[in-house]
């Protein structure tokens, strides 16, 4: 890594491969599985759903450990990445009621709302502790995308809103797949506060649609308005990437 003293680089490599980072991720994995088990007291679930959620979270932890080993620029994961991992744990916990056939509802909304609130904490902790990184920003984005997808599946299974809700839940993954064919889509985007605002609106709408406070027609209208906002955001990003492609 450029600009890092050789002794510092050696310390980072040791932390990633066999030092503090694997141990910290291991402890966080245990805490996350415990969080998922505790969430089962709030949301519907059965033993097979709990097992699936736990295994999904352990897979997330394994992927995080691998990505950190490849290029994480710090020697500890920090509270910021612990919070993001716990958010991922809550997303995995939401698989339990979905797999149990009890999609949506107030409990699902409460768990998802907690994950949304924590979304503002990990970035703050990263900046305050000096542990901000491209990895952390990407991990935060992927946690948001996973939450949106799982909530969309709940909506399809439990409400009158149809498969069109996947515009809110799967657009990020379509964008990533498109980037595999079009390399210019993988370029870094400039920071835009409106992008974060639209993400919050996206998740908030998906949470709102979990609970029976809107008529079916109102729910569909709200979903479509949020989808238009999200589509506009992605269109603006794609336009910027196209104009700056080399």
What feature does the model see in each segment?
Residues 131-132, 136, 187-190:
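Cytosolic-biased juxtamembrane loops and peripheral soluble domains of multi-pass membrane proteins
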